[in-house]
From Swiss-Prot:
Pfam families: Fer4_7. Disulfide bonds: none annotated. It comes from the Bacteria. This is 4Fe-4S ferredoxin FdxA. [4Fe-4S] cluster 2 binds at C19, C38, C41, C44. Binds 2 [4Fe-4S] clusters. GO terms for cellular component: cytoplasm. [4Fe-4S] cluster 1 binds at C9, C12, C15, C48. It comes from Gottschalkia acidurici (strain ATCC 7906 / DSM 604 / BCRC 14475 / CIP 104303 / KCTC 5404 / NCIMB 10678 / 9a) (Clostridium acidurici). GO terms for molecular function: 4 iron, 4 sulfur cluster binding; electron transfer activity; metal ion binding. The gene is fdxA. The keyword Repeat applies. SUPFAM superfamilies: 4Fe-4S ferredoxins.
Amino acid sequence: MAYVINEACISCGACEPECPVNAISSGDDRYVIDADTCIDCGACAGVCPVDAPVQA
């Protein structure tokens, strides 16, 4: 299961550089995770100050 970024995202960008497979990019109102690229490692969740990345 891939991670998704929920509506709690404050677009701080902390998660993007932590992703080892570059699955995270900035979206219109929050960051988004490409489910096909995500390897479910949880690195994004570990650095998010608002716990926005959650397992889908």
